[in-house]
């Protein structure tokens, strides 16, 4: 009741197989203020994250329990899609009436910068509809787990913000993931519009405290990370760290360092990025987060095509 007022719909992007979607729908059903027509609209490309064999391995427990059968197996092998699997998993439960799954994709680079219209998406093109929202719907809670790129985040927020009002909560499930530096950058650039209200593990919840226009986003958040001066990033991440200290959020004090290193690597400063991450191994953070730091050293972030930014590659001449 404190996060969702029950009056508008809930929006989710990136549900995968719907674990979070299920929790959202169950919570909505328990809210006494829920309007009858309120639903959770969940968007995903519902396919091609994994090779079919990998997806089948991930789903093995459901095959063993009889939830999925040979028909679903053959469908996955043939189509590399899991929307039908999503439906089978949830349709037997009452909460599924609250869920409206939709196929859609976000661009990872601006379409007008892509001469062959193939690199706009991290995965090969298919017939999935580009992400958009129905004109008649509004939302008062937004769960974000599908903004896996800088431009995709910009596109999502430009489309979504006009459908939400002050008081809407945005729940960013990848905010604390070291690869996704664009999320804290976006929220810090527009920090007067968003107020941090809660965080658990990697998930950070912000309240929209002032309406943010598409024009303001276009003016202040460019299409590429390379279009912001490095000096601005240095100041931005210092402010983020200061905020984390004020919240006694020791994990983010470390993670902002890892995200800044990922950004440096993305911009081509690989030696500096590597040194910054290695430095964390000699800090007190390594006592509790050593594996997380080593993971960042191995996979600091990725480019718009989904390729790892390898911090151990020699500089290009």
Which residue stretches match the model-derived regions?
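S-adenosylmethionine/decaboxylated-SAM
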Residues: 3-313
């Amino acid at each position: 009741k404190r996060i969702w007022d029950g009056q508008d719909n809930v929006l989710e992007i990136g549900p995968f197989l719907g674990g979070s979607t299920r929790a959202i729908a169950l919570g909505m059903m328990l809210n006494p203020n829920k309007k009858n027509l309120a639903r959770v609209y969940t968007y995903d490309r519902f396919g091609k994250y994994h090779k079919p064999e990998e997806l089948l391995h991930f789903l093995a427990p459901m095959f063993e329990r009889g939830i999925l059968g040979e028909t679903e197996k053959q469908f996955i092998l043939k189509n590399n899609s899991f929307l039908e699997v999503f439906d089978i998993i949830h349709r037997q439960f009452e909460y599924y009436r609250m869920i409206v799954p939709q196929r859609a994709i976000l661009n990872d680079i601006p379409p007008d910068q892509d001469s062959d219209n193939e690199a706009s998406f991290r995965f090969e093109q298919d017939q999935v509809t580009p992400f958009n929202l129905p004109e008649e719907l509004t939302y008062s809670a937004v769960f974000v787990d599908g903004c896996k790129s800088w431009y995709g985040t910009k596109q999502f927020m430009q489309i979504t913000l006009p459908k939400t009002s002050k008081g809407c909560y945005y729940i960013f499930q990848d905010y604390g993931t070291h690869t996704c530096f664009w999320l804290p950058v976006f929220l810090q650039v527009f920090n007067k519009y968003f107020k941090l209200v809660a965080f658990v593990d990697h998930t950070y919840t912000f309240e929209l405290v002032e309406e943010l226009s598409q024009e303001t986003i276009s003016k202040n958040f460019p299409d590429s990370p390379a279009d912001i001066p490095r000096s601005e990033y240095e100041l931005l991440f210092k402010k983020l760290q200061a905020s984390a200290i004020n919240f006694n959020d020791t994990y983010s004090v470390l993670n902002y360092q890892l995200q800044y290193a990922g950004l440096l690597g993305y911009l081509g400063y690989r030696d500096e990025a590597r040194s910054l991450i290695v430095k964390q191994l000699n800090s007190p953070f390594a006592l509790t987060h050593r594996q997380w730091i080593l993971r960042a050293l191995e996979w600091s972030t990725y480019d718009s095509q989904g390729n790892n930014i390898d911090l151990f590659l020699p500089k290009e001449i």
